[in-house]
């Protein structure tokens, strides 16, 4: 079973932050230390802030636990939703999978500054970063999708023992019509996004398909 806590996961400190520190982090960074009178009313409780933030296009966070272990960290922003899956490797928490969903047309925003939502307020899977770790080789695959059926792919391999690395970049054609998914309906309606195996084309995680541009 999943459990949601509206708390910040601190990768540097390798821990889930307290409610007080989570809210202070939102005040300091997101609100630039200047919350207004209305915001202050909700900044005394992390879940109440999440409810307010969802309805008012503000930033909030949540750490997802599965069977009492840390499973994922979600950052909700007005224009994007970031999902970082969490695992343990050699005694440290790592992010083996990172998903970025756009809530608005990023190209239109950077071109004109206008906020243009997708049809039905759907989300668009804009990026995937998939990492695998072994003592001999670490692999990172990053895919950035565009709305015009193109994707930028970066394949990186590092060899810790030899202290060597190599990277390959390429542009590929891809049918991004499959990248759309419904938007959350409530402040706590995010668990369905964790089911990436059913939400996302399996080919996006297939190194052979990516290498041959067969997407």
Q: Where in the sequence are the language-model features?
A:
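Conserved anchor residues at repeat-unit boundaries in beta-strand-based tandem repeats, strongest
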Residues: 65, 86-89, 118, 145-146, ...
